[in-house]
């Protein structure tokens, strides 16, 4: 899930130029073909943690509460699972044959599904502009 979070927030950081940057920055880019302001904006943006970037988008774009809950509660559950030494050790020792029936792996899978549902809602359902950007730049 951490890789998905990093990938998703990388996309969001790029999309933030269009969705969250000031009109002046976007105008400077279009009218003057100057990327200086946009570069500075991105430089500041990428200094945030992935969870901060995600939270900013959820708040600024007024994404549905249900989506935010799915994303943050599932990620919190994932971190809690990783913090559980017994479960982490069990997953490390898990054989390929045991994956389909392992209770802890099933727990990870369930948490991951909820996180994926949140990402799908965020990128494709809750905000029209974000959906357009995802289809144009994120789906080849």
Task: Please describe what each predicted stretch is.
Residues 1-140:
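Conserved nucleotidyltransferase catalytic core and NTase-mimicking acidic/glycine-rich helix/loop elements
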């Amino acid at each position: 899930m951490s890789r998905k979070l990093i990938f998703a927030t990388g996309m969001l950081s790029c999309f933030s130029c269009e969705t969250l940057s000031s009109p002046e920055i976007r105008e400077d880019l279009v009218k003057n073909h100057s990327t200086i302001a946009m570069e500075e904006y991105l430089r500041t943006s990428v200094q945030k943690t992935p969870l901060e970037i995600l939270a900013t988008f959820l708040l600024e774009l007024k994404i549905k509460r249900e989506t935010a809950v799915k994303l943050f509660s599932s990620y919190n559950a994932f971190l809690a699972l990783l913090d559980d030494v017994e479960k982490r050790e069990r997953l490390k020792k898990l054989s390929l044959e045991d994956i389909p029936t392992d209770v802890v792996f099933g727990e990870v899978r369930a948490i991951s599904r909820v996180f994926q549902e949140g990402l799908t809602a965020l990128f494709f359902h809750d905000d029209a502009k974000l959906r357009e950007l995802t289809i144009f730049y994120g789906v080849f």
